[in-house]
Structure formats: structure tokens, C-alpha cells
Regions:
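NTP/phosphate- and nucleic-acid-binding module
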Residues: 1-479
Length: 479
């Protein structure tokens, strides 16, 4: 086996300037373009194809677990948003507000949806009367608008694409179970589709979603050592139910309020894919996600039989269920190799006259550049399938090793700063549960609490105040 070590000079090296590297990959791989409005990007076909793959996988999982898709309006009356005090206070600073309809001032301002809890609540209150109407488990695929001051493609935009699920239940137990199930589906999606390991846990009171009783999160670690919140699932209890009068008659004919959840992931996942797996040559896509899993590049394609053989291989692989393309453009093989690497296509097959004569082809793995000769026979589809599965495992294992090596247990404040400055990643520490100590770490080290460990009990004292610890919590600098 040999390694392919082409360097793409169009991309700033990742370890020289991570932010510029990220922007270069987004642009050069043709995932997006900037529009004339800050924070509102154009999703180019290749970038949107990645989102479609995520949609397809997750939509199937949602429907398997009893959820239905709906669509709610984009505009929310201001009075409706104001019904839940904590919720509106959390979102008011980032709301986009419509004040005119045509040339006329509106009697009531309309909020461009930052999230749709209030719309779902209003609707559920109308359609639910009895325990027989429950549960209601709705999801919508849409865009949201939150007026961000600092924007970056996919990671933080004023407009973002996402799914938001909203469910109501007759019992607290059922709603809590739903909350954790959806968090687990997000974690599964990250592992099985994106090859990204996640840190999971519960958000602190300060970091939880506005209006929620509890928020559960999946947190990814980027190559630069910063965390990225990649999905959240919220348990609301009956707060919204009481504000919106969402009630039902139970089996004993008693009037009760419902219990509610919401959960969502967004196109932030595209940013995670780039920053976890990408390298100096561009994207590195997990095979199960990649819109094109295999690209076949004919060498000396004008010679008799070369293009025909490339098409024959493509037909074989497509028949076996793989997503395949043949690059028969008139560009040079070197250009095609570079383009395939930039786009992160997991497997490249090279086939030319000599390969055909000898009955083999050259297979190149994008994740590590390893080249292998494979026979051009009926076993090729299985060999390529196995290679794709190997790539997924290697990518996940590499990301998991990076994550695990960047979780550092600390016992003092000085250690927090030292680890974050020199190593990055997560610091794992005891915490008393007081917001003042949480804020102290943010002020001193620009790090926020990412989640509370659900599996480890605190044993010791909080390094900020010396009081007995209540939780083990992870802090990190984050996007």
C-alpha cells in the first residue's frame, strides 16, 4: 500500500490559521456562498446535499419513533411570544421583527420565527381535549432567524436550517422519556452517520434553554480544541402548558395540564463535520453521509475501452447500492484527484489502459490517502463496500481518540487555565452548582459549562469556592 500526499495550495493550512482554513474549505468545496445580507448564506448544491442526507437519516428515525412532520408559519405575533416570560426574555435580543405590511404599519409586530414553541402551544391547545388525543409528537423541517452579531458559515448564522420537534404528553414520565430518547437519537445520528463521537449530559441552570426545566445536549470537539453544541433536547414540564392553557381530561374526567418537550439539530452539524474530519486538502466526508461515496477517474480516457470500463465499474457499484460518479471531464487526472479530495469523496478509483490489461484498478481512501490495488472482477463491489465501512470506523475511532485525549480532570483553578491555554478541549471538574462559580470560570478563562456528567457523582470540593461539590461538570471554550 502507498499513500497519496497531494497538498492543496488553495487552502490555508489548518494548523496555521484554523478560522481561515475553515472558510477556505467552505468556499473551495462549494458548500456555500455569502449573500448580500450578513449571516444569511447561500447553500450551494453540494452543501445542501449534505443537509439532505442528514434530513433523510433523521426523518426516518423520527417516523420510526412515532413522530409526524408538520409546518408552522414563519411569523409569530409578538403577544404570543410574550406569553412565556422566561422564553421571551431568552430570545428577545436576537429577534427579527416585522413592523410593516406593504407600506402600512402593522397593528401588532410580528416576530420572524427564532423557534416555534409558542406556535405549537397555541395549536396544541386548540386540538387536544382528552387523554385519547395524547401524545402529540410533531416535527418540522424549516429555517429559523436569530439576529447574530458575529456570524460564521453553518456554525452561527442569522438564518439557519434545522428541525424542531415539539411533543406533548399526559404524564411527566412519558415526557421525560421522550426528552432522553431524542437526545439519544441525536447521539446515534452523530456516530452512525457523521462518524462523530459526542459528549452528552445535562445543561446547567444558566445554560439551559429559555423556558425549559431541563436541557440535555450533545457536544462535539473540533480539531482546534473548541466545543460545539450540536443538538439539544428540552424537558419543559408544564410551564408552557399553563401559560397557553394546554389541558386535557384524563381517564377520571379530571382536567390536567400536559407535559411538554422540544428538541432540535441544525446545519451546525455541517460545521462539525468540516472541523472534526477535514484536513489541509479539504473535506473528509464519512462514507454513510457522502452524497458521492465513490468517484471513478479514468486515466488516458480517450484510449479505447477506458471510459467503457469506468462506466462498467460504476454500474456494478451502483447495483450494489453505492452512490457513484465517473469524472469523464477533459481536465487532467491530477486536477480530478485534487477536486475529489477537496470534496471529501471517501473512495477514489483510478483505472487506465494498463490497469484494464492487468485486470485491476487503484483504490485510494480519502481519510488517510492509502492506495490499494483491487481486482476488476465480481468481488469488487463487496471489496469497495468493505472499504467504505472501514473508512467510517477509522474516522470515528480517530475522532474518539482525539476527544478522549482532550478531556482533562482538574482540581484547581490554575489547572483550568493551563489546560485550556496549552491543550484545549474539555476540563472536567467538581462544581458546587452555584452560578457565581460558573461565571467566574467564564470571566477568567472565557470557558463555559458544556454539560453536567450524568454518570459520575461529585466527590470533593469546588475549586472555585471550596464548598462541597454537587456535580461533575465539563467546561470548554466553545463556538
Amino acid at each position: 500500500m502507498a499513500k497519496n500526499n497531494i497538498k492543496n495550495d488553495a487552502i490555508t493550512p489548518r494548523d496555521v490559521d484554523f478560522a481561515q482554513w475553515y472558510t477556505d474549505v467552505c468556499r473551495k468545496a462549494e458548500l456555500m456562498d455569502y449573500s448580500s445580507v450578513k449571516g444569511f448564506i447561500i447553500y450551494r448544491p453540494y452543501g445542501y446535499a449534505l443537509w439532505e442526507q442528514i434530513q433523510s437519516y433523521m426523518d426516518k428515525r423520527f417516523k420510526e419513533t412515532g413522530h409526524q412532520n408538520v409546518y408552522m408559519p414563519m411569523l409569530i405575533p409578538e403577544s404570543l411570544l410574550n406569553k412565556e416570560k422566561d422564553h421571551v426574555e431568552g430570545f428577545a435580543p436576537e429577534c427579527a421583527v416585522v413592523t410593516k405590511g406593504g407600506l402600512d404599519d402593522l397593528e401588532e409586530h410580528l416576530i420572524v420565527r427564532p423557534t416555534s414553541e409558542t406556535l405549537f402551544c397555541e395549536h396544541y391547545a386548540k386540538i387536544v381535549n382528552s387523554y385519547r388525543d395524547l401524545p402529540k409528537k410533531y416535527n418540522q423541517w424549516c429555517s429559523g432567524v436569530r439576529w447574530e452579531k458575529t456570524t460564521r458559515p453553518f456554525l452561527r448564522g442569522s438564518e439557519f436550517l434545522w428541525q424542531e420537534g415539539h411533543t406533548i404528553h399526559a404524564t411527566e414520565e412519558e415526557a421525560r422519556s421522550e426528552t432522553l430518547m431524542m437526545r439519544d437519537i441525536y447521539e446515534e445520528t452523530a456516530k452512525e452517520l457523521l462518524a462523530i463521537p459526542m459528549l452528552t449530559g445535562r445543561k446547567t441552570e444558566r445554560e439551559k434553554f429559555a423556558g425549559a426545566e431541563e436541557t440535555y445536549t450533545i457536544e462535539a470537539l473540533m480539531h482546534d480544541g473548541k466545543a460545539l453544541q450540536s443538538g439539544t433536547s428540552h424537558y419543559f414540564g408544564q410551564g408552557f402548558a399553563k401559560a397557553f392553557n394546554m389541558t386535557f381530561l384524563d381517564k377520571d374526567n379530571k382536567l390536567k395540564h400536559v407535559y411538554q418537550t422540544s428538541w432540535g439539530v441544525s446545519t451546525r452539524l455541517l460545521g462539525a463535520i468540516i472541523m472534526v474530519h477535514g484536513d489541509d486538502n479539504g473535506l473528509v466526508l464519512p462514507p454513510r453521509l457522502a452524497p458521492t461515496q465513490v468517484v471513478i477517474i479514468p486515466i488516458q480516457q480517450k484510449k479505447a475501452g477506458v471510459l467503457e470500463k469506468a462506466d462498467e465499474i460504476a454500474a456494478q457499484l451502483k447495483a450494489a447500492g453505492m452512490r457513484v460518479s465517473v469524472d469523464a471531464s477533459d481536465k487532467s487526472p491530477g486536477w480530478k484527484f485534487s477536486e475529489a479530495e477537496m470534496r471529501g469523496i471517501p473512495v477514489r478509483i483510478e483505472v487506465g489502459p494498463r490497469d484494464i490489461e492487468n485486470g485491476h484498478c487503484v483504490v485510494v481512501k480519502r481519510n488517510d490517502g492509502v492506495k490499494t490495488q483491487m481486482d476488476l472482477d465480481e468481488n469488487l463491489p463487496q471489496a469497495i463496500h468493505d472499504t467504505l465501512e472501514t473508512i467510517h470506523k477509522e474516522m470515528y475511532d480517530k475522532a474518539a481518540a482525539f476527544l478522549n485525549s482532550h478531556i482533562t480532570r482538574v482540581n484547581t483553578l490554575d489547572e483550568v487555565g493551563k489546560v485550556l491555554d496549552e491543550k484545549g478541549g474539555y476540563v472536567k471538574m467538581n462544581w458546587c452548582g452555584e452560578e457565581a462559580c460558573e461565571l467566574k470560570i467564564k470571566e477568567l478563562y472565557q470557558a463555559t459549562s458544556r454539560c453536567i456528567d450524568e454518570h459520575e457523582e461529585a466527590d470533593g470540593v469546588c475549586p472555585c469556592c471550596g464548598k462541597k461539590a454537587k456535580h461533575v461538570v465539563y467546561f470548554a471554550r466553545a463556538y
